[in-house]
């Protein structure tokens, strides 16, 4: 099955809502985004702001977190 980052990138690119993204992560047997995890909370913010994958990666990099790959 696809990696967690691939699923998240695809969901961002498709502009899916956060609940749809959580469902996609579950269906692909990947862990859901968890707000108490710093990187995940940045990703949750990106979904809320409808950021692109590129803008999300810029934000992750600025926050010293691994970019989506």
Regions found by a protein language model. Give the residues of each.
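Helix N-cap / loop-to-helix initiation motif
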Residues: 3, 15-20, 52
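Short amphipathic recognition helices of helix-turn-helix/homeodomain-type DNA-binding modules
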Residues: 20-51, 57, 61-69
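Short, basic-rich loop-to-helix N-cap that marks the start of a DNA-contacting helix
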Residues: 1-13
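Generic short alpha-helical segment signal, independent of protein family or function
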Residues: 12-15, 29
């Amino acid at each position: 099955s696809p990696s967690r980052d691939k699923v998240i990138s695809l969901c961002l690119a498709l502009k899916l809502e956060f609940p749809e993204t959580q469902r996609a992560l579950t269906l692909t047997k990947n862990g859901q985004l968890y707000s108490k995890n710093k990187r995940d909370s940045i990703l949750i913010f990106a979904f809320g702001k409808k950021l692109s994958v590129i803008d999300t990666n810029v934000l992750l990099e600025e926050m010293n977190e691994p970019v989506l790959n």
